[in-house]
Curated annotation (Swiss-Prot):
A family per Pfam: LEA_3a
Record protein name field: Late embryogenesis abundant protein Lea5-A
UniProt keywords, alphabetically: Stress response
Similarity section: Belongs to the LEA type 3 family.
Gene that encodes it: LEA5-A
InterPro entries xref list: LEA_3a (IPR004926)
Disulfide bonds: none
Upper classification of the organism: Eukaryota, Viridiplantae, Streptophyta, Embryophyta, Tracheophyta
Gene Ontology biological process terms in this record: response to stress
Induction: By water stress; in leaves.
Length: 105
């Protein structure tokens, strides 16, 4: 009898845990959009819009040239963004920004 009560407690606890997990679990999908569209309706069937979109994607990716946003710096050799301007020393920047006009009295 004691054995059946302990197994009932274990079974009840495991059912409660499974129910709690299923309620508190968030449903994020890991499937790519093509797999989702292909899963509805006939297996492997794609509509005209999806087929046209897939053809545009494949043709544009083949014609597109590869470019990276990072390029090696000619001075240091380290990689830095391509669109980054040249660095200016603080003293040079201060000299450019300060107005050196002498006021005549």
């Amino acid at each position: 009898m004691a054995r059946s009560v302990s197994s009932f407690k274990f079974l009840g606890a495991s059912v409660f845990d499974a129910l709690y997990v299923s309620i508190s679990r968030r449903g994020y999908s890991g499937a790519p959009p093509a797999a989702v569209t292909a899963s509805f309706g006939r297996p492997g069937a794609m509509g005209k819009v999806e087929r046209r979109y897939a053809m545009k994607e494949s043709s544009s990716s083949e014609t597109r040239a590869y470019s990276s946003a990072w390029a090696p710096d000619p001075v240091t050799g380290y990689y830095r963004p391509e669109n980054c301007g040249a660095e200016i020393d603080a003293a040079d920047l201060r000299e450019m920004m300060l107005n050196h006009r002498v006021r005549s009295q």
